[in-house]
A protein has these predicted regions:
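Glycine/small-residue-rich loop that forms an oxyanion/phosphate-binding "nest" at active or ligand-binding sites
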Residues: 3
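Class I S-adenosylmethionine-dependent transferase superfamily signal
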Residues: 15, 41, 113, 135-139
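Conserved SAM/SAH cofactor-binding pocket of Class I
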Residues: 7-108
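Conserved Class I SAM-dependent methyltransferase catalytic core
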Residues: 126-171
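Mobile active-site "lid"/loop adjacent to the S-adenosyl-L-methionine
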Residues: 100-131
């Protein structure tokens, strides 16, 4: 399971700016890992409910435990599945911090990161966009009209992400 970092806090803060405490929304967290994103969002927005998915059974179990510790287990449902195979409902908000480090950059990561986190939670394929491509494509089917997609991306991935979003009519 990926260890949350300050960049992920920024993702959560940006979501908080988009929605008020009074709104009632459905949230989908793709690649939930420890559950830190959806748990942080739901803890701050009491009228939100969520679904969290991950391909790792271990990650799902950790996320369930964390949700229970924060008294949110009745507001989050967890599924062990990939984004490719997920077709349940439509959502107001989709969030994700997927693996986005390119295969070439992985070898340059700090040993502290590589020694404690599964490569599956870090590497996003040859160009870092394997999972992004799946998420963006699927989000066009899973978002309600007017829904939002909020993703954490790498420092050098902005223009490639904009191109991908345009391809799937997000911008």
């Amino acid at each position: 399971v990926l260890i949350p970092r300050p960049d992920t806090e920024i993702l959560v803060e940006e979501v908080m700016k988009l929605y008020s405490n009074e709104q009632k929304l459905s949230v989908l967290d793709i690649g939930t890992g420890s559950g830190c994103i959806i748990i942080s969002i739901l803890k701050d927005r009491p009228k939100f409910n969520g679904i969290a998915i991950d391909i790792s059974k271990k990650a799902i179990n950790i996320a369930k435990y964390n949700a229970k510790m924060h008294h949110l287990n009745n507001r989050i449902k967890f599924y062990k599945t990939s984004v490719d195979n997920f077709f349940k409902d439509k959502y107001d908000l989709i969030v994700s911090n997927p693996p986005y480090i390119s295969r070439l950059q992985i070898k340059y990561l700090d040993k502290d990161i590589l020694g404690f986190e599964p490569i599956q939670a870090l590497e996003g394929g040859i160009d870092g966009f394997n999972v992004y491509s799946k998420i963006v494509k699927k989000s066009s089917m899973l978002l309600k009209v007017g829904g939002k997609l909020v993703l954490e991306i790498g420092f050098d991935q902005k223009f490639k992400m904009l191109k991908l979003l345009k391809k799937h009519v997000f911008v």
